[in-house]
Regions:
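N-terminal secretory signal peptides that target proteins for export/translocation
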Residues: 1-3
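Short beta->alpha junction loops
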Residues: 56-61
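Catalytic nucleophile-elbow at a beta strand-turn-alpha helix junction centered on a G-D-S/GDSL motif
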Residues: 26-40, 62, 91
Length: 218
């Protein structure tokens, strides 16, 4: 299978000087939903001169969709590090049914880890799903519900899988809670203010650098 064209599939930011590099920069793939889309360019900027950052243009949506697109988004790119999240779309509630029930969510996460390990030598980092402000989210009238209690439930399920599989966790949920979610989350109760995205980007960058070489940015 041909490698996907970056201009069509990825937002790719090569952060390097114009001169040829003696040692190729490590390649990092960011996978996740619209929260990832928000922090991806900030992560790329923070990794300037240290990595090639790839971030698929499409929203990753739920864990089943990530699994379905894993070859295109991850495997074919042969990354050195994969920073991945899924969860906020899985726990969407409509007509009293979750988009992806938590038991299936766990199975999907296990399959994602297995597929990445089978198809690449990449280091994997899992990011927890970020908090929801229930009242503000409900005001969106988006045709589905999300609740913070479910975010916590799905994160707990993900943490169990990652602990069992020895995958390090970038706990973005705790980061936002500790930083004051009411001031970091925007008026839709889900997405972030510019300051919020900067805090997320710093944490994501930190986890990637720690995975690659033990560096710290904060």
């Amino acid at each position: 299978m041909a490698t996907p064209c970056w201009s069509a599939v990825f937002v790719a930011i090569l952060i390097a000087s114009g001169a040829a590099q003696e040692t190729p920069l490590p390649k990092v793939v960011l996978i996740g939903d619209s929260i990832r889309i928000g922090y991806a360019p900030l992560v790329a900027k923070r990794l300037e001169g240290k990595a090639i950052v790839l971030s698929p243009k499409p929203n990753g949506e739920d864990s089943g969709n990530v699994l379905k697109n894993l070859d295109e988004w991850v495997i074919n790119e042969r990354p050195d590090v994969v920073h991945i999240n899924a969860g906020l779309h899985d726990l969407k509630l409509k007509d009293k049914s979750y988009q992806v029930p938590v038991a299936q969510y766990e199975k999907n996460l296990k399959a994602i880890l297995e597929r990445i390990r089978k198809g690449t030598t990449a280091k994997i980092i899992f990011a927890t799903s970020t908090p929801i402000l229930d009242t503000l989210h409900a005001q969106r009238k988006a045709g589905f519900d999300r609740f913070e209690a479910d975010v916590e439930k799905y994160n707990a399920a993900a943490m169990k899988v990652m602990t069992q599989d020895g995958v390090p966790v970038d706990d973005l949920h705790r980061l936002v809670e500790d930083g004051g979610k009411e001031k970091l989350i925007g008026p839709d109760g889900t997405h972030y203010t510019p300051a919020g995205y900067e805090i997320l980007a710093a944490a994501v960058t930190d986890s990637i650098l720690h995975s690659m070489e033990g560096e710290r940015t904060r």
